[in-house]
Amino acid sequence: KVGPDFIDPGLHAQMAGLPSRNLDGWMLSREYNQGLFQSCLARADLGVVEGVMGLFDGYDGTSEAGSTAEMAKWLGLPVVLVVDARSMARSAAALVYGFSRFDPGLRVAGVLFNRLGGPGHLEYLKEAMAGNLPEIPVLGGIPREDLIGIPERHLGLVTADETPLHPERKEKLVELLERYVDLDLLLERSVYPPGVTPRETGGGGRLLSAAPEAPDVSPPLMAPQQPIPSGGKPPEFLRQAPRPVIAVARDAAFCFYYPDNFELLEEAGGLLHFFSPLAGETFPRGADGLYLGGGYPELFAQDLSERTDFLESIRGAAGGGMPIYAECGGLMVLGRFIETLEGKRFAMAGVFPFGTRMLSRRKALGYTEVVLREPCLLGEPGLTVRGHEFHYSEIVEEENAAVRCAYELRRRKYSEARPEGYQVGSVLASYIHLHWGSAPIAARSFVMRCREYAKGRERHRADIR
């Protein structure tokens, strides 16, 4: 998936039976994207990259930075245009003509028409394409089908954790593709991208970039930064030291995570333990750190408020100095309460002396960059990490004296920096979803703090004995 979205990769994984990753031209360097892409594709027979917004939409109207087009060129991929042809016939060919000529450096391998009225509609479209763009094949045309629609809500589509792709919907999707798309031609138009060695079996290593022709969300407004060095692997002595256990809440309430962040934690020596608060689970007593990702705690606020063992264990861990890192929904759970749109308040962990309130309108959306201004779980002052924020809630009843901010946040190209990254003791929480691939040292720092906490507990037990 191109862009920072969490939901689409989850749906990809449900359909493909394999993890899906985020490629991002703003949060991550060109080298990082290329390395991730090549690593994943080397283990597969076929890869598909879904675009973000429209093909050429990026952070502004003057360049391709952060766009699907940029990513296709970085990775050496042809593009399949997915065109919503509802209420269009010959005009669809004009649309494809403009997209295929807009950037001579991009190769459009074919077009797939969507939401058609019937077989006659597809024939009109094929005639228009053959008469004006014979070099761009029509790969197929999907008719309108209500059954395959995925429900939407605030923050986007319903997530994979809530199983919107039930078996009947999956079967219908497969049936439509097999019936209405020329899959052989699609594979024929795919390529072996640079730097990828095809697998010995199957058709391995081919890849296409699928891009919608029109945007559906506002583009980000920040300029891309220069490539960020990966920082290399952690020192050998760190990877061989006893592995600290990092508990990760993961279910429908906590479902916004980048798989890269998990891998970076493991590469730094962390041992991840996943648990589901909604299923009544809490993190193990032997945990040395806690990671609370974003998601939809507001939809499960009553359930979470009734999971008193979970909330009390968080309070106890925070009071005992355990490193706890939380993002967005995780921040909400660490507050005193979550207030719903109906005005109901549900008690949460109370680690921070403020609550959060849901809003009917979006509070924030866009790419962000944070600069550490104080030492914290993620590193020392001066470190820059990139991410994004997207939320419909805000902090309320804040007692500023009790909370320090570890970050300086820059959200837009010309906006003033503001404090973020709320810190109390060993707890760090923020509305920002950080991608540690932009600064792997952040993951290593968190693991180091967890390791130090584990050693401190061992010393305490030894003193007692």
Language-model features: where?
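Structural motif
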Residues: 48-50, 80-82, 112, 247, ...
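A short helix->loop->beta-strand "cap" motif at the edges of active sites that frequently abuts
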Residues: 77, 136, 319-322
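Cysteine-nucleophile active-site neighborhood
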Residues: 297-377
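Internal gly/pro-rich beta-alpha loop/helix module
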Residues: 89-200
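ATP-dependent carboxylate-amine ligase catalytic core
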Residues: 1-75, 79, 83-110, 119-123
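Phosphate-binding active sites in nucleotide-utilizing proteins
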Residues: 244-308, 312-317
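Amide-donor transfer/coupling interface in amidating biosynthetic enzymes
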Residues: 148-201, 211, 221, 229, ...
